[in-house]
Design a protein with these regions (language model features):
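Peripheral, non-AAA+ core regions of ATP-driven protein-machinery
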Residues: 1-202
């Protein structure tokens, strides 16, 4: 099964859109990562594998091909951990495909499934807003800077398990998950006072 998740790669001061594609196919278990990934991204195979297992999800027992498109764009950094993990969950049937529609995300994963901050979030948020993303998912430490981009819904959670559980139960606000809408006219004052709007994950 093929699944996709949207993210971006920082190129200087600008973020370039990247489609993370994950395909599961019959064959000897293994993970092949293509699309000009740097060393940090190549190592994401082990981080994601451990994060999935320690978060209570099934790891793939088939051949996995992960493609970062476009193939001619050099990608750097561990921020692709989260989109790879989410696409893997969809491809393996552990997360519904509609949960990723219109969603952009970035973040490093700890081996325990925790979401860790990444670089270039403001540029990524600006690009996501430009492409009319439904929402951007980032680690908690990046949520404040991402919210500087107006007109974009920002979602965050402490760990992968919380994020997925919230996605599967959109009518409830999972403990430890926070969702805020970027500043809009009339909201700037409440934002500066620390106010945030809780939103369900669609």
């Amino acid at each position: 099964m093929l699944a996709r998740c949207l993210s971006a790669s920082l190129q200087g001061l600008e973020a370039r859109p990247v489609v993370v594609e994950v395909d599961l196919a019959p064959g000897l278990p293994g993970v092949q990562l293509v699309g000009l990934p740097d060393k940090a991204i190549q190592e994401s195979r082990e981080r994601v594998r451990s994060a999935l297992r320690n978060s209570g999800f099934r790891g793939p027992l088939v051949r996995v091909v992960i493609n970062l498109a476009p193939a001619d764009l050099r990608k750097e950094g561990p921020s692709f951990d989260l989109p790879i993990a989410l696409a893997l969950l969809v491809a393996s049937g552990q997360l519904a495909r509609p949960q990723l529609e219109g969603l952009w995300c970035a973040g490093e994963l700890g081996l325990d499934g925790s979401l860790r901050p990444c670089r270039g979030v403001i540029a990524l948020a600006a690009k996501a807003q430009q492409h009319k993303a439904q929402a951007l998912v980032v680690p908690p430490e990046n949520a404040q800077e991402a919210s500087l981009i107006e007109g974009l819904t920002i979602r965050t959670a402490a760990n992968l398990r919380t994020l997925v559980e919230h996605a599967q139960r959109p009518s409830t606000v999972a403990r430890g998950a926070h969702h805020c809408r970027s500043q809009r006219p009339g909201q700037r004052r409440s934002k500066r006072r620390g106010g945030s709007e809780l939103l369900p994950l669609h």
